[in-house]
Amino acid sequence: MAKRDYYEVLGVSKTSTEQEIKSAYRKLAKKYHPDMNKESGAEEKFKEVNEAASVLLDADKKAKYDQFGHAAFDGSSGFGGSGFGGFEDFFSNMGGGMDFGDIFSDLFGGGRSGRSSRRGPSKGQDIGLEATLTFKELVFGVNKKTILNLVKTCTKCDGVGAENPSDVHICTKCNGAGQIIVNKQMGPFQVQNQVTCDKCNGVGKEFKSKCKNCHGKGVESKREEVEIPLPKGLWPGQQFVMRGKGHASLEGGIPGDLYITIGIVKSDVFELIPNSNDLIMNYNISYLDAILGNEVIIKTLDGPVRLKIPKGVYSGQLIKVHDKGLYKNQTSDKRGDLLIKISISIPTSVSKEEKKILKELEQLSNFEPKNIID
């Protein structure tokens, strides 16, 4: 049976880059790997994919193949058939640092076989919360308190997991490494892979007598009040991190972190401006303030502020109050501006006395609206 074109096997072209060929190979090797694909013919396709990649990812072999095709390797071309080396040889000879562990480590959940020593104890799990703030809290910061159900280091055994420290022994299966080597059959090849020890669950220890409080886990569950000091200069959607305030590690490592995502209470008064430290404040004035240009006192997040209304102001106009917006960041004292967005209130009804005065004003006014038809 004639061999298929190697480019066709991998689904690439002669102009494909080395990285594109590697990417195509990765996908197909995983797709047809015998441990992942039990369909009939998968193993043969897996071998075919490996053979194609071993040529197209070797610059010399690829050049010969592009010139002579399959004949370059069957001894009829005058070059002599170099043949295909072992499976491991193929990976070790491929360029760009690509090797067996890079491609298949995720198939078995472990790292590269025989290349790493015992990993350190894993970090505790992180916790995620959302803190919904008022605009004043967002600008100036606030201390929030909340109750968390935490995994904490056992108070009785101090995380050892045993009644007495002398009751702790090295795991006899992994010799304290926390990981063991297992053999995986990959078609005609056998590969060693490093995985977590199933006897000690990666801890590397065994217990003669487990702690009665935590049953050997080294941790216990506790409800705890946590104070969260949220600083100034935060932004909705931003995450504030408290290191070491998450769950305790099950393996004696460092605790996880507490991530607080910032939210904001909806307001009819204040508005945020995307990608800006300025803050909009909606403010209603009377039609008399708009006409006369009065001075008003407005209640801002910083307290009362005097604001001069310009004569003839219109609804939607912005009046700037400097340095009363959001802080630039958590450490800066510089702030954006407060933009007062004017809304003019027109009364729907007036008293007889007001109406009389308005009529007199109307007589004095020289305003003549233009006829838009003209």
From Swiss-Prot:
Zn(2+) 2 binds at C171, C174, C197, C200. It comes from the Bacteria. CXXCXGXG motif repeats lie at residues 154-161, 171-178, 197-204, 211-218. It is found in: Cytoplasm. Binds 2 Zn(2+) ions per monomer. CDD domains: DnaJ, DnaJ_C, DnaJ_zf. Gene3D superfamilies: DnaJ domain, Heat shock protein DnaJ, cysteine-rich domain, Urease metallochaperone UreE, N-terminal domain. Belongs to the DnaJ family. Participates actively in the response to hyperosmotic and heat shock by preventing the aggregation of stress-denatured proteins and by disaggregating proteins, also in an autonomous, DnaK-independent fashion. Unfolded proteins bind initially to DnaJ; upon interaction with the DnaJ-bound protein, DnaK hydrolyzes its bound ATP, resulting in the formation of a stable complex. GrpE releases ADP from DnaK; ATP binding to DnaK triggers the release of the substrate protein, thus completing the reaction cycle. The J domain is necessary and sufficient to stimulate DnaK ATPase activity. Zinc center 1 plays an important role in the autonomous, DnaK-independent chaperone activity of DnaJ. Zinc center 2 is essential for interaction with DnaK and for DnaJ activity. This is Chaperone protein DnaJ.
